[in-house]
UniProtKB/Swiss-Prot annotation:
This is Uridylate kinase. The gene is pyrH. InterPro entries: AceGlu_kinase-like_sf, Asp/Glu/Uridylate_kinase, Uridylate_kinase, Uridylate_kinase_bac. NCBIfam families: pyrH_bact (TIGR02075). SUPFAM superfamilies: Carbamate kinase-like. Pathway: Pyrimidine metabolism; CTP biosynthesis via de novo pathway; UDP from UMP (UMPK route): step 1/1. ATP binds at residues 12-15, 55, 59, 162-163, 168, 171.
Length: 238
C-alpha cells in the first residue's frame, strides 16, 4: 500500500451529497458510509478536518431569491451546515472513532467555537474535526470556507468531494465529449469558469499555495485512495 501523500488535509463535503438518493434532509446510510471512509483515511496516519455544506437543508442564495435578505439567507444556510456537522460527528463517534464538531458561531450548548487553537488541539488528540457554520459571514461559500480553514490550520491540501471524478471542460453527464483534466493551475480553473468550486475559493487557494484535489466520493474508500495518490481526480495547483 502506498504511503499517504499528505499528513493533514481538509475534506470538503457538499450538503446535497449527505441527502443521498433524496432531495432533502440527511440520509443516514450515506452519512455512515462517509464516516467509514473518513475513519479509514485517518488510520493511514492523516489528520483530517471536514467542512460540510448545507444545501440539503437550506441554500442561502435560493432563500434570498424568495424575498429574504441575502445576509439572512446565508446565515440560515450556515446554520444548516451545523446540523450536518453534528450528524457526521455523531456517525463517526458511533463507530468508535473520536470526532470533534467546531462551529463558526458561538453556540456553547451545541458545540465548541472554531478557533485555530481548538482545531489544532483536536487534531493533535487524534480527532476527526468536523467544521460547521461556514465562515460565519454571509456571501462566502463553504468551498471558500474549506480553503480558508485549510490555510488557518496548516493543512497541505483540500480534497473536494463531488459526484464526478475530477474537473471537466463541460458537464460530462450532458456532454459526452467533455474533457477531463488531470491537472490545472489555480488561474486556469478561475479563467475556465469551471463550476466545481467558486472563483473566490480558487483565488484564495492560489494566494495560499494550497492544492485542491477534485474527486468522486461515490466509491467506498475514495478518500483514502486519493490521499495515497492512487485515486482518479483533478489536481488544481500552481
Amino acid at each position: 500500500m502506498a504511503e499517504p501523500v499528505y499528513r493533514r488535509v481538509v475534506v470538503k463535503l457538499s450538503g446535497e451529497y449527505l441527502a443521498g438518493p433524496h432531495s432533502f434532509g440527511i440520509d443516514q446510510a450515506t452519512v455512515d458510509r462517509i464516516a467509514d471512509d473518513l475513519i479509514a483515511a485517518q488510520k493511514l496516519g492523516i489528520e483530517i478536518a471536514v467542512v460540510v455544506g448545507g444545501g440539503n437543508m437550506v441554500r442561502g442564495v435560493e432563500v434570498s431569491s424568495q424575498g429574504v435578505s441575502r445576509p439572512t439567507g446565508d446565515t440560515m444556510g450556515m446554520l444548516a451546515t451545523v446540523m450536518n456537522c453534528l450528524a457526521l460527528e455523531a456517525a463517526i463517534q458511533r463507530k468508535g472513532a473520536p470526532a470533534q464538531a467546531l462551529s463558526a458561531f458561538v453556540m456553547p450548548q451545541v458545540c465548541e467555537l472554531f478557533t485555530r487553537a481548538a482545531a489544532h488541539k483536536a487534531l493533535a488528540e487524534g480527532r476527526i474535526v468536523v467544521l460547521g457554520g461556514g465562515t460565519g459571514n454571509p456571501y462566502f461559500t463553504t468551498d471558500t470556507t474549506a480553503v480558508l480553514r485549510a490555510a488557518e490550520i496548516g493543512a497541505q491540501a483540500v480534497l473536494k468531494a463531488t459526484n464526478v471524478d475530477g474537473v471537466y471542460s463541460a458537464d460530462p453527464k450532458k456532454d459526452p465529449a467533455a474533457k477531463r483534466f488531470d491537472r490545472l493551475t489555480h488561474s486556469q480553473a478561475i479563467e475556465g469558469g469551471y463550476k466545481v468550486m467558486d472563483a473566490t475559493a480558487f483565488a484564495l487557494a492560489r494566494e495560499t499555495s494550497l492544492p485542491i484535489i477534485v474527486f468522486s466520493i461515490a466509491e467506498p474508500g475514495a478518500i483514502g485512495a486519493m490521499l495515497r495518490g492512487e485515486g482518479r481526480g483533478t489536481i488544481v495547483a500552481g
